[in-house]
């Protein structure tokens, strides 16, 4: 089993669920972060530590126009990228444009720390760019991250289908090997 496992695929296909179910109570021992979708009609997204003790809103659709605070990734996100193993759920969004966060992410990816994560699929990445009116630099950063993961011999990026049992099995096997 490769030290770094990332699940990707369409929104709502069960990537985060597979990771949460595979980790169970071990999730609270992880370093890294979770991005949480909150609300029903008026959405907002928070960045949270896996144990839930630290959180901050970084994207809010509750007003007339989306409010984005990517500094949350530089201040909180970068700080959370330490631990015996990391959960990164999810990367590949606008946080790729935040320098301090990207430095911390680069260090984590270059390290021997086991990582279990979700990487935003290319289609949703393009939609995010349009919705938030991000520059072309975002698509370039997204492509650079995908290339880096694809070229790393110690990383597996698995594309999930809808509620893919193989995704959960991969996550469970990763947990058995890398989580104390």
Residue ranges of predicted features:
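Flexible, charged surface loops at secondary-structure boundaries
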Residues: 1, 25-27, 79-84, 109-110
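P-loop (Walker A) phosphate-binding loop of NTP-binding proteins
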Residues: 10
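Conserved lysine of the Walker
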Residues: 15-16
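A structural signal for short, well-ordered beta-strand segments and their strand-loop junctions
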Residues: 32-34, 88, 117
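N-terminal export/assembly leader peptides and their processing motifs that target proteins to secretory
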Residues: 48-51, 71-79, 177-178
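Phosphate-binding/switch loop-helix module in NTP-utilizing enzymes
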Residues: 61-106
């Amino acid at each position: 089993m490769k030290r770094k496992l990332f699940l990707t695929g369409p929104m709502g296909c069960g990537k985060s669920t597979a990771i949460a179910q595979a980790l169970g109570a071990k999730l609270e021992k992880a370093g890294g972060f979770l991005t949480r979708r909150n609300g029903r009609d008026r959405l907002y997204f928070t960045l949270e530590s896996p144990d839930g003790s630290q959180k901050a809103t970084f994207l809010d659709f509750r007003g007339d126009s989306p409010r984005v605070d990517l500094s949350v990734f530089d201040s909180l996100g970068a700080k959370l990228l330490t631990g015996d193993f990391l959960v990164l759920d999810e990367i590949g969004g606008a946080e790729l444009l935040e320098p301090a966060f990207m430095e911390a992410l680069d260090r984590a990816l270059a390290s021997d720390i086991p990582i279990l994560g979700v990487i935003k699929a290319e289609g949703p990445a393009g939609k995010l760019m349009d919705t938030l009116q991000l520059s072309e630099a975002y698509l370039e950063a997204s492509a650079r991250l995908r290339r880096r993961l694809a070229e790393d011999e110690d990383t597996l990026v698995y594309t999930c289908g809808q509620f893919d049992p193989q995704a959960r099995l991969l996550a469970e096997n990763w947990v058995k090997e890398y989580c104390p």
